[in-house]
Amino acid sequence: MIKYSFLLTALVLFLRALKLEAGDIVIYWGQNGNEGSLADTCATNNYAIVNIAFLVVFGNGQNPVLNLAGHCDPNAGACTGLSNDIRACQNQGIKVMLSLGGGAGSYFLSSADDARNVANYLWNNYLGGQSNTRPLGDAVLDGIDFDIEGGTTQHWDELAKTLSQFSQQRKVYLTAAPQCPFPDTWLNGALSTGLFDYVWVQFYNNPPCQYSGGSADNLKNYWNQWNAIQAGKIFLGLPAAQGAAGSGFIPSDVLVSQVLPLINGSPKYGGVMLWSKFYDNGYSSAIKANV
């Protein structure tokens, strides 16, 4: 009996170790009203992190604007009910982030002071602070995702530093979604702070560094460069379907058999990020066991 108990304990510890070393799947949610609710997204049990997309207007004295496509209208106060969904996700151990920027929007940091003002706004309206005008209600998000693809290359480092300081009160996870050309045009300064917990690099819509023509050589080369930055974990960002991006889609069987084996031994390998929930019609389920 003692020997059996020892073997059982050893097996449990081994399986826990495997789970700790396994990668996670990250998904973007919020840009299509037909993609299902946030709660349903988390209930699939496929994702470890969900990025709510996007805060499309902020900085430079502008009134911040959250765009959740057909899900709800934040300007009319119709998104506060998402607090229940956010808590449902978090109760399952899933982190829920607010994503800033995106490919379309009006965002710009005009100065370091402007960046600090934006950080204070985010803390009070989405994170652990207090405000009477919280667009998503009283739920506290886990952190902020930087999906910056325009505006300015400056002051994102100050935004990251100020947000990070709030972690003294409650942990604020910082994540980023740079393009795969290295270094990233917009976020290089912010990433150089070394403050980011997770970085999911967009290996799509960028032919020089994505999977192309049956070859993962370019992807692997740029992956190695990204893996060398000072960050917690690096994720492979991909479209979840052919129609989710202009280029860079990798069929699930090819990803599992040819691409992931090239990168999942990297010290900072974190898993796979997918754009987006609307396009994820079985892709995450097909790769989950191998991520």
From Swiss-Prot:
The keyword Hydrolase applies. Induction: By TMV infection. Disulfide bonds join C42-C89, C72-C79, C180-C209. It is an enzyme of class 3 (hydrolase). GO terms for biological process: chitin catabolic process; defense response to fungus; polysaccharide catabolic process. It is found in: Secreted, Cell wall. The active site is at E149. GO terms for cellular component: extracellular region. Residues 23-291 form the GH18 domain. Its main location: secreted. GO terms for molecular function: endochitinase activity. CDD domains: GH18_hevamine_XipI_class_III. Keywords: Carbohydrate metabolism, Cell wall, Chitin degradation, Disulfide bond, Glycosidase, Hydrolase, Polysaccharide degradation, Secreted, Signal. It catalyses: Random endo-hydrolysis of N-acetyl-beta-D-glucosaminide (1->4)-beta-linkages in chitin and chitodextrins. It comes from the Eukaryota. It holds the Pfam family Glyco_hydro_18. Its EC number is 3.2.1.14. The keyword Hydrolase applies. Residues 1-22 form the signal peptide. Belongs to the glycosyl hydrolase 18 family. Chitinase class II subfamily. This protein functions as a defense against chitin containing fungal pathogens. This is Acidic endochitinase. It comes from Nicotiana tabacum (Common tobacco).
